[in-house]
Amino acid sequence: MLMTRPNLKGRSFLAEKDFTQEELLYFLDLAAELKEKKKNGIPHHYLEGKNVALLFEKTSTRTRCAFTVACTDLGANPEYLGKGDIQLGKKESVEDTAKVLGRMFDGIEFRGFNHETVESLAQNSGVPVWNGLTDMWHPTQTLADLLTIREHIGKLKNVKLVYVGDGRNNVANSLLVGGAIVGMDVRICTPESLWPAQEVIDLAKKYNEQVMITSNVEEAVANADVIYTDVWVSMGEEEKFAERVELLKPYQVNMKMIKATGNENVIFLHCLPAFHDVETMYGEEVYEKYGLKEMEVTDEVFRSKHSKVFDQAENRMHTIKAVMAATLGNME
């Protein structure tokens, strides 16, 4: 049953920090409801007749597919604009582009590099803008993560989530702050040189003093409910690969780490794509250069009963749908 519905109409969805605990939990409740409706073939055309621009500076599989299917299910018309279709800040300023798109579209999704770009789109377009990923935050991913955790564990409050890997990336930032807002015990486990920015840590601690930042794997994973990792090198950082491999080898998620939690029901999450074998061109290249058949997670863990990564990937669509419906849709 849905909790009391907050009024989110016309709001942009740029980062978790812009929302209260009640609002984030409402997104999850709505996502669960829409997921059930889709499963049962019940129409939910809350965006009937709306036009949505999907702006992608960065390529994507899950984000693009999730937004496209979500738009279609909600009755909206999605228009994909890749980096070759739109020149944000090159031939036309972001401000001018936002004003043009706002005259033609009812909502805008942006996936790219600078967070300032998505903020400018929101400030100048006059329509709801949704952050599909920036270098700073990845809020639609976090909503999917939270829904997946709640589905498998039954709650969020006091759930111990350990993020292991590059603690400075957008996924870690969003999990740290978003998890703290909903009352989770979030722990970031990474070498000190990759700890989150102090401003992000301070922001998370405003919501929950339990936040832990540590380089000690054993300390971090003790009694964990969720182990989460991401790629060791984000898009645009490929030149740092050799350095990151050496730094993060001790933080690989393997069965030894899973067992160290002491929780036989611990779940494993990853925002994907994951480098857990050599079945890709990238995986082959890494193996040839560094002799690694697995990187941030072993194939054993990835394919184990603990892994919920494909539930998590599916939930991108349901949570994105909830965000669009709540901020743009006719929910009466």
UniProtKB/Swiss-Prot annotation:
An example Gene Ontology biological process: arginine catabolic process to ornithine
GO molecular function, one term: ornithine carbamoyltransferase activity
SUPFAM superfamilies: Aspartate/ornithine carbamoyltransferase
Catalytic reaction annotation: carbamoyl phosphate + L-ornithine = L-citrulline + phosphate + H(+)
Protein origin, superkingdom: Bacteria
Pathway note: Amino-acid degradation; L-arginine degradation via ADI pathway; carbamoyl phosphate from L-arginine: step 2/2
One cellular-component annotation, GO: cytoplasm
Residues that coordinate or bind L-ornithine: N170, D230, S234, M235
Annotated TM spans: none
Keyword Cytoplasm carried by entry: yes
Protein's job: Reversibly catalyzes the transfer of the carbamoyl group from carbamoyl phosphate (CP) to the N(epsilon) atom of ornithine (ORN) to produce L-citrulline.
HAMAP family (UniProt xref): OTCase
Protein name (Swiss-Prot/TrEMBL): Ornithine carbamoyltransferase, catabolic
Source organism: Bacillus cereus (strain ATCC 14579 / DSM 31 / CCUG 7414 / JCM 2152 / NBRC 15305 / NCIMB 9373 / NCTC 2599 / NRRL B-3711)
